[in-house]
Amino acid sequence: MSIVSLLGIEVLNNPAKFTDPYEFEITFECLEPLKEDLEWKLTYVGSSRSLDHDQELDSILVGPVPVGINKFLFQADPPSPELIPASELVSVTVILLSCSYADREFVRVGYYVNNEYDSEELRENPPAKVQVEHVVRNILAEKPRVTRFNIVWDNEDGNADEYPPEQQVDEEEEEEEEEEEEEDDEEEEEEKDVEGEEGEEGEDAEEAAEVEENGSKEASKEEDIEEDIEEDIEEDIEEDIEIEDEEEAKNADQGETPIDKVQS
């Protein structure tokens, strides 16, 4: 649980010239007495491509902090234009207002800042060299991005490593995306299982068809064998009959009959 809660920030001189100081009225609540001061700091992001151009505009120690709701005015100098890449001086950038306790940052507020020329002529036809005196800034104060960090306070035992390093404001969205991805994966696995079952059923059907076909082939083979055996038996019977007929014919030619042979 955070001992210090940020209640509100009001951006005072906005819009303003690029060379004007920054002014913020900050309201926060302290739930318990603090042993150390709070450190507030304002950082200007000079380039979106490198951290080397970031400038710490100012920092202030607030303390001792009484329990309850507190309010103070924070002023910071403007950034040095010579430390900002010329291609990014007249553009959109970010300022970061952060607060730390015992060198541990627990809240950070980011604002978009739009830097542009103060006349339509310069905006349509910007000079080759940036004219800083004609550049104005506009802080999008109505759309701050707040990030909170869990730290160990005076009344808490333990190590800071036991706490998650930070809690992003988009944590819920990331969890929803992860849940959606898991659901998609489960659906894909179910589809694969269904396809696998259908494939197995198809294979079983093919095997059954093959077994049935083989069975019918074997049955037809057995029928053919039986027919061949019957034909052979019929042929043998016909041959025996022909032989008997031939013998009877021979005996008839000799004038003998089976009866005559018996009598003689």
Curated annotation (Swiss-Prot):
Keyword Chaperone among UniProt keywords: yes
Molecular function terms from GO: acetyltransferase activator activity; histone binding
Protein origin, superkingdom: Eukaryota
Signal peptide span: none
Family: Belongs to the ASF1 family.
Role noted for this protein: Histone chaperone that facilitates histone deposition and histone exchange and removal during nucleosome assembly and disassembly.
Name under which the protein is recorded: Histone chaperone ASF1
Lineage: Eukaryota, Fungi, Dikarya, Ascomycota, Saccharomycotina
